[in-house]
Design a protein with these regions (language model features):
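Structured beta-strand-rich core segments of catalytic domains in phosphoester-bond hydrolases
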Residues: 1-2, 6-53, 135-140
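Active-site micro-motifs of SAM-dependent methyltransferase domains
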Residues: 5, 63, 98
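A structural signal for well-ordered alpha-helical scaffolds and beta->alpha junctions
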Residues: 6, 33-35, 70-75, 116-117, ...
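Structural signal for conserved beta-strand scaffold positions within catalytic alpha/beta enzyme cores
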Residues: 12-14, 58, 110-112
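Second-shell loop/turn segments in exported
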Residues: 26, 61-67
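His/acidic metal-ligating clusters that form di-metal
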Residues: 34-57, 67-105
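Metal-dependent phosphoester-hydrolase catalytic domains
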Residues: 81-91, 96-163
Length: 163
């Protein structure tokens, strides 16, 4: 019932820099996962005494296989993080549940540079043309001591340089 959902201990923290979608009651009825986007603004040291603020976004899109759902989540991120006109240089990474050759992420591809992908895990940099990226890697993380792995995805890394 709705009361059980409201009283559930499984809640996401929300506030500045944290946004969710798929939160309506109808989503619980049909078994959709809640998905979210979080970001943090960090001050990166530079040769300039003031440094540079960079926004880092992490997100996880639905794995429903429906392009329109993925595109709606992409639009949510573009809107919530201000990617049309980013306040700061921005790096977005996460499980977007679409592969390399997809045309499902038109907003990200139009507004930013696609740094790399491993399976469905992507790194994008915004605004377009402000970053160079190299050394994109997926790191194998086998289970330790016979225990289950923490995730079905291996971590990804890249070196990004702000121009």
């Amino acid at each position: 019932s709705e009361m059980c959902i409201r009283d559930s201990p499984y809640k996401h923290a929300k506030g500045e820099g944290n946004y969710q979608w798929n939160t309506g009651y109808e989503y619980y009825l049909y078994g959709y996962d809640q998905r979210s986007m979080g970001y943090i603004d960090i001050l990166v040291p530079t040769s300039d005494s003031d440094g540079q603020i960079v926004r880092i976004i992490c997100t996880h899109f639905d794995h429903c296989g429906i392009d329109q759902v993925i595109q709606q989540q992409e639009q949510n991120v573009v809107t919530q993080a201000g990617l049309n006109n980013p306040e700061y240089p921005t790096i977005l990474m996460g499980d977007l549940n679409v592969g390399w050759g997809t045309n499902v992420l038109p907003e990200f591809r139009n507004l930013g540079d696609h740094i790399g992908v491993s399976w469905v895990d992507h790194i994008f940099a915004f605004p377009k043309g402000r970053w160079t990226g190299h050394d994109f890697k997926s790191h194998s993380c086998p289970a330790a001591n016979g225990k289950a792995s923490l995730s079905d995805h291996d971590p990804i890394t890249a070196t990004l340089v702000l121009k």
